[in-house]
Amino acid sequence: MPPRAPLLCFVLAGSLLSSGAIAADASAPPDDACALAARPLRAPDLQVPFDIVDGRIYLQVQVNGRGPFRFAVDTGASGIGRADTRLATALDLPLHGQATTSDGVSSASVQVVRIDSLALGAVVRRDVEVITRDYNAHNAPEAAFMGILGRGFFDDGLLVIDYPRRMLSFSRTQQLPTQGTNVLRYERAFRVPVRIGGEQVLGQLDTGANVRFVLPRAMYDTVSAGPLEAAGRSRLTNSQVEAQRATVQGPIEIGQLRLADVEVRVSAKYPELLIGAHALQQAVVLIDQRTRAVAICR
């Protein structure tokens, strides 16, 4: 089982869209990745509304033909998905060994269960093995979920997360180009180019993290001279880290998204820049793992 990237929980911290609801952007050049965000996908395999709680995406999933169950969509999670212990118990999911998971700071041994079918609308994954653990121990009741859809669930098509319209779409017949305007290529999922002021860095796109940004302390010192305030301990999947709070003047630019005067978390322990869900609420996020490309559109 591949390691799991952090699902951050900082403790101290719709209706269906009709096919004609988004007007096509006739001014966009043919190789502009954001042209796909400006018009409805042609005959998508999937188009479903989602809810947002504390920045995170929640939608309804069928497990072994039962449900629906509330799942989160987490691009920071490797593999097909995760099962909360409540789901594993309710469905009597069979144990299938153990795995090691990492949150970027520390590792832990976890149990694995087997699921016969995991279905989001017409998109179905069969005979999958997923990590199971208590994912809700530190969640508020309104943020509780029964499982997670990881990036592997969407690895054979184009995933479109339209935050303003709260709509998730998926297509195997359309794809992001490998180069062109607004194309963000990545080598390691999903580390994309980010510009902070005059600095060009890589940031991990993580829809499961209920923050705007997390910066390693060394990176923060190169992009801002602003003061830091204590923010207590921030909880990762396997561990906790001391965090501080600051405002980065920026601008912070990711694709078409441009943010200024952004509150961020800073930690000397965290290994890389993290782009969390709260930074993406005004964006349309497109991810195509077949072409290893991402687009962040407005």
Language-model segments: residues:
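Bacterial N-terminal signal peptides
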Residues: C9-S19
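Pepsin/retropepsin-fold aspartyl endopeptidases
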Residues: I22-R298
